[in-house]
């Protein structure tokens, strides 16, 4: 009997659930980066040219800083032996404070900023409650 499929190849597609299961088993390829302040973070091997600010210092992981590995053998293909560049210091902004800890407002009894004038939930109708639950 002749095959009804128009394709002459004998390739069968791997089901998506099997593909996901295989992808979950792969180890996460990431690089540990230690900051001068003593903190460290992990950067995914495929994530580059993105920066962030930590304790007032901007850090950027560019493609020049990467070591590329094959199959988990941990031997570098490419290494950049340049001296590390100093991180870029951000200029102080109008809303930044010299303190590293930001104080929180004290709790108080009274109207909230979100629902001013709301004294009791007992005064709400069922349609009001249904609306609030839908948010």
From Swiss-Prot:
* GO MF term set: DNA binding; structural molecule activity; zinc ion binding
Taxonomic superkingdom: Viruses
Record's keyword annotation contains DNA-binding: yes
Query: Which region ranges are annotated with the description Transactivation?
Result: 120-135
The protein's UniProt keywords, in alphabetical order, are: Activator, DNA-binding, Host cytoplasm, Host nucleus, Host-virus interaction, Inhibition of host innate immune response by virus, Metal-binding, Phosphoprotein, Suppressor of RNA silencing, Viral immunoevasion, Zinc, Zinc-finger
Q: Which family does it belong to?
A: Belongs to the geminiviridae transcriptional activator protein family.
UniProt-recorded name of the protein: Transcriptional activator protein
Q: Which organism is it from?
A: Tomato leaf curl virus (strain Australia) (ToLCV)
């Amino acid at each position: 009997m002749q095959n009804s499929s128009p394709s002459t190849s004998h390739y069968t597609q791997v089901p998506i659930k099997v593909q996901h299961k295989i992808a979950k088993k792969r180890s996460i390829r990431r690089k540990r980066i230690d900051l001068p302040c003593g903190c460290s973070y992990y950067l995914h091997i495929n994530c580059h040219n993105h920066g962030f600010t930590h304790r007032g210092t901007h850090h950027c992981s560019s493609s020049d800083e990467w070591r590329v590995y094959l199959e988990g053998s941990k031997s570098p293909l490419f290494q950049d032996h340049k001296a590390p560049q100093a991180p870029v210091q951000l200029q102080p902004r109008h809303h930044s404070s010299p303190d590293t800890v930001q104080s929180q407002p004290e709790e108080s009894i009274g109207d909230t900023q979100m629902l001013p004038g709301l004294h009791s939930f007992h005064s709400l109708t069922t349609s009001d409650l249904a609306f609030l639950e839908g948010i």
